[in-house]
Amino acid sequence: MKFRRVFVLVLLSLFLVSCSAGKNEKPVEETAKESGEGAKRIGVIQIADHIALERARKGFEDEIKNTNPDVEIISKNANGDLTVVPSIIKSFQDKNVDLIYAIATPAAQGAKNGEKEIPIIFNAVTDPESADLLENLEEPEGNITGVSDYFSIEAQLEEMISIFPDIKNIGVMFSTNEANSKFQIEELKKAAAGFGLNVVEVGVNNINDVSTAIKTIEPKIDIFMAITDNTVSSASTIIAESLKEAKIPSFASEEGPVENGILISAGVDYVDLGKKAAGMASEILGGKKVSEVPVVFSTDTRKVVNKKTADALGLSEDDNLMKDAKVVE
């Protein structure tokens, strides 16, 4: 009888231990899931596929992973199709992202129009105000701030004239669909007038118009300037080849088009801009309000020359062109 009672007590003890272990297992599982909730999730939207925007994305992603190793990045590319931007923003909302990184003006505008609460960091936007992204650069209102790729047009023209002192007519192409580009054209006209230079402009609706457009202005220009325009950047190889055949030098505001054949750039570094955006994102993910993170403008610039294009134009021995330049083949 005593043995039976002891046996029952042992079974009861084992049962209680088992129940206790079962209760402990569930909280351990929930804790593991909750640890995942601490990892931040960022939605990245890139408006088109060209070197400058790729660099702005890579600079951001590399830097944000360096400072936030557990961050999850969901990257989407609209491939130049503005109609898919709303659905990309919706997909970020469905994924409950903590922050949106929008690369280029149309991506930033789409993000702002589609989302009013999730913090948005833009990049590769020349004039955030004329793009209607915000009004206060120092204390951004709403949920959006970011990095501007604006670089002084006057400084670029000074560099251009120092290399090509005899130029009179500057050719420029722009997308009629980008407010960013229209702003740059107006700035260029004002600055060029101060140097006694004339601007010959041509607008394009899409990349299919580029070949014809560049041919129409080549007889009228001494040099071509590639502004930071998504259509122009995407078609920079086409533009560069046409200009080389016409023996017309070309100038860009950033390095990407130079890798595609444009002669020279003196302007911003988009990898650096991406890193700056990542720093802003880290501040916001760390608890800062968007209004406490002012818009950033680049102060770092560099000169890059395409060696093959310089050779084709007979300029590879030009000291003014090659001085202090990074050379790409």
What are these regions (language model features)?
Residues E34-E61, T67, I74-T83, N177, ...:
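Extracytoplasmic "Venus flytrap"
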Residues N77-E135, D229-K244, I248:
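Beta-alpha junction/loop-to-helix N-cap segments that form part of ligand/metal-binding clefts
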Residues P128-I167, V268-K288:
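Hydrophobic alpha-helical segments within soluble ligand-binding/sensing domains
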Residues G256-K308:
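Flexible loop/turn connectors
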Residues S20-K23:
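Bacterial signal peptide processing site
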Residues E72-D94, G203-I217:
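Structural motif
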Residues I42, F60, T145-A192, P294-T309:
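An alpha-beta-alpha
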Residues F15-S18:
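C-terminal motif of bacterial Sec signal peptides marking the signal peptidase cleavage site
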